[in-house]
C-alpha cells in the first residue's frame, strides 16, 4: 500500500475498513460482522484519537469512548443492549478522574463514586432502586476509611446488626417526615 491508502480486510463475515498513512492507521476505522457494526474507531498516527464507539451484537451502541493519544480522555459512556445508559465515567490520561455514575435499568442513579488518578477518593454513595440512599462511605487513596453508613429502603440508618433503627429514634434525631 502507498501513503494514504484506504484498505478493506475481509475474513468470513467480518470486515475491517480504514485508512493508512505512512504505515499507521489514520482516520476512521470501521469493524463490521454479518453486516452489523461492531466498532467505529478513530485514529491519528496509529493511535486512538477522537470518539470511538463499540456496538452490541444487536447493533445498538455499547460504549462511547473519547481518546487522546491512545488514552481515554473525557466522559466515557456505557449502554445496555436496550440502549439505556448504564455508566458514565470521566477519564484523564487514561485513568478514572472525578465522578463515575452507575445507573439502574430505569435510569435512576445506582452509585456515585469519585476518583483521583485512577484511585477511589472521597465520597461513595450507593442507592436503592427507589432512589433512597443505601450506603455512604469515604475513601482515601483507594482505602475505605470506615465501614460507612448503610440505610434501609425507607431511608432509616441500619445498625451494626444490619437492622433499621426504630422509627421513633430515627424521627427523634432527624425530625418527622411530612
Which role does the model predict for each range below?
Residues 1-80, 84-103, 108-116, 120-126, ...:
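Periodic aromatic/glycine/histidine/acidic cluster detector
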Amino acid at each position: 500500500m502507498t501513503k494514504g491508502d484506504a484498505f478493506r480486510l475481509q475474513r468470513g463475515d467480518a470486515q475491517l475498513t480504514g485508512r493508512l498513512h505512512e504505515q499507521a492507521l489514520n482516520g476512521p476505522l470501521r469493524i463490521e460482522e454479518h453486516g452489523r457494526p461492531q466498532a467505529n474507531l478513530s485514529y491519528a498516527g496509529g493511535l486512538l484519537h477522537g470518539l470511538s464507539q463499540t456496538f452490541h451484537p444487536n447493533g445498538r451502541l455499547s460504549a462511547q469512548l473519547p481518546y487522546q493519544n491512545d488514552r481515554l480522555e473525557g466522559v466515557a459512556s456505557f449502554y445496555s443492549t436496550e440502549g439505556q445508559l448504564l455508566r458514565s465515567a470521566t477519564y484523564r490520561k487514561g485513568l478514572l478522574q472525578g465522578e463515575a455514575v452507575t445507573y439502574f435499568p430505569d435510569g435512576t442513579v445506582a452509585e456515585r463514586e469519585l476518583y483521583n488518578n485512577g484511585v477511589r477518593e472521597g465520597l461513595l454513595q450507593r442507592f436503592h432502586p427507589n432512589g433512597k440512599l443505601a450506603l455512604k462511605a469515604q475513601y482515601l487513596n483507594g482505602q475505605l476509611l470506615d465501614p460507612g453508613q448503610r440505610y434501609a429502603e425507607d431511608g432509616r440508618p441500619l445498625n451494626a446488626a444490619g437492622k433499621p433503627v426504630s422509627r421513633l429514634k430515627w424521627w427523634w434525631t432527624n425530625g418527622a417526615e411530612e
